[in-house]
Design a protein with these regions (language model features):
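Extracytoplasmic gate region of multi-pass secondary transporters
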Residues: 70-75, 270-325, 381, 413-420
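C-terminal ends and interior cores of transmembrane alpha-helices
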Residues: 123-141, 348-362
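Hydrophobic core of transmembrane alpha-helices in multi-pass small-molecule transporters
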Residues: 64, 128, 143-161, 365-383, ...
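Juxtamembrane intracellular "pre-TM" segments in multi-pass secondary transporters
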Residues: 42-49, 239-275
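Cytoplasmic helix-loop-helix junction between adjacent transmembrane helices
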Residues: 151-190
Length: 470
């Protein structure tokens, strides 16, 4: 009874208040989380912490707005009534390109450094968004699917530098014991990007015109590229600070750097890295099956103006922030910086949520259930892709480790795009929410397999030769 009452109350509010509420909620959640962040003292000076903030904030904001230049496709789809088949095809080829690109871009980031590759990501993705915007100015027809798929795939190639870059840069700036909290920060950045991508893009499409969802993100990305060039540095020493040993998998490794093939072999023969990669395959499947398809479900079934769909980006942002911080704090302070237990618990939430969605498709509760599921899956992604990759790859090999793990995330994304474009209802059949029963049925097996795999790394912990922090 509570959900319908809240929906009716929201519908009766004046427009200005409906616009203000999401912003206030978002600011409140961010303030709550920031003030509650645990302090892990590993001996960093105040000057070091200040310079580190100036380092990760620009690169983090760049990563967030890369999300806006990635998930804006959903807003464009809904604005121009693109078919599920065309949307799934474009999304699938973008995801495949993103996943496979890590085979090249992971080692390349280890070689070039995260500062250079975040610039490549921002400038390249910005240029491809401009190209998609120019194509969109000519109007959408289904025969443009191939061209959009090609441009979106090129966009996703440049996008793939983003995650590797942010983890590569921060691997040298964060001690192992600080990284659970950093995993929470990683979740915040992902979540802010989702807010921009879904809520801002929808408002841009409705308030200006659909092609502008591809023109606004490049403007922001190009400005942030300038900030990255000015402030971001790969290591503390490059920024005039003292380097330190983060006590990760690279600790004590002072020999010459391994070649790309040797590093890849080391990563691919690590049972822990392979299990984490497999878990993240299902994370990619579930994350995008929820985030991308719930707005499509809401529009098709006529509920797009109710509270959850109308504020989807804000709710994803809040869920992601809380999920990321909760996962990071529990990992560091309950499980001794082990990532597997938290991933297992969150996957359990995903499995339970799939069952609840199956029995609530026709009611207002389904939106809130998928918000909670988003909290769980963003928490897993930040914990494993953003944190475990640093732990087990080490700062010297983190590019390859992230490449393997995030590559699997986007292969999972491609699998969901290929699966859901065929099994979900389209056209008039999509108007009946009960015809969407295939949606939770597709989610449940992925959640179960991810849970079983996550339990395999319950006790996994990175090891290296300890050294004193500065």
């Amino acid at each position: 009874m509570l959900a319908p009452a809240m929906g009716e109350l929201y519908a009766n509010l004046p427009q200005w208040l409906r616009e203000l509420i999401p912003i206030l909620v978002l600011l409140g959640v961010i303030a709550l989380v920031v003030t509650r962040l645990p302090k892990v003292d590993v001996g960093h000076s105040a000057a070091f912490r200040s310079r580190r903030l100036l380092n990760w904030l620009p690169v983090g904001l760049t990563y967030a707005f890369l999300y806006m230049g990635r998930y804006n496709l959903t807003a464009f789809k809904n604005a121009v009534d693109m078919s599920n088949d065309a949307y799934g095809t474009i999304d699938m080829w973008g995801a495949v390109t993103y996943g496979v690109s890590f085979l090249l871009n992971g080692p390349l980031t280890d070689k070039l450094g995260g500062r250079k590759t975040i610039l490549i990501a921002a400038l390249g993705a910005g240029a491809m968004n401009v190209a998609m915007g120019i194509l969109a100015l000519r109007g959408w027809t289904e025969d443009k699917t191939l061209w959009f798929a090609l441009l979106y795939a090129a966009n996703m190639y440049f996008q793939s530098f983003g995650a590797v870059s942010i983890v590569k840069v921060n691997a040298s700036w964060f001690h192992l014991r600080e990284r659970g909290t950093f995993g929470g920060i990683f979740g915040v950045l992902i979540s802010l990007g989702l807010y921009f991508a879904y809520d801002w893009s929808r408002k841009i499409a409705e308030g200006i015109s659909p092609p502008w969802v591809f023109f606004i993100p490049p403007m922001i990305l190009f400005a942030l590229a300038v900030a990255d060039f000015i402030w971001v540095r790969d290591t503390p020493a490059d920024a005039g600070q003292k380097d330190f040993d983060p006590e990760d998998a690279s600790s004590g490794d002072t020999g010459p750097p391994l070649g790309v093939l040797a590093v890849a072999k080391r990563m691919l023969t690590s049972p822990i890295i392979l299990v984490i990669a497999a878990v993240e395959f299902f994370s990619g499947f579930l994350r995008n099956a929820i985030m991308k398809w719930y707005p499509v479900f809401a529009k098709a079934t006529g509920i797009k103006d109710t509270f959850v769909p109308a504020n989807w980006g804000m709710l994803l942002c809040c869920a992601g922030i809380l999920g990321g911080m909760l996962a990071g704090v529990i990992s560091d302070h309950v499980f001794g910086s082990r990532r597997g237990p938290v991933a297992s618990l969150l996957y359990g939430g995903m499995l339970a949520g799939s069952g609840v969605v199956a029995v609530t498709l026709g009611g207002p509760l389904v939106g809130w259930v998928v918000v909670v599921m988003s909290l769980c899956i963003i928490g897993v992604h930040g914990m494993l892709s953003g944190t475990a990759s640093m732990d087990f790859g080490g700062r010297r090999n983190v590019g390859v480790a992230v490449g393997i793990i995030d590559g699997f995330v986007y292969l999972g994304t491609a699998a969901q795009a290929l699966t859901l474009k065929h099994v979900l209802p389209d056209g008039p059949a999509a108007r009946d929410p009960h015809n969407w029963w295939t949606w939770p049925v597709a989610l449940a097996p992925a959640a179960l397999l991810g849970l079983l795999l996550a339990t395999r790394v319950w006790n996994a912990r990175a090891s290296g030769k300890p050294a004193a922090a500065h």
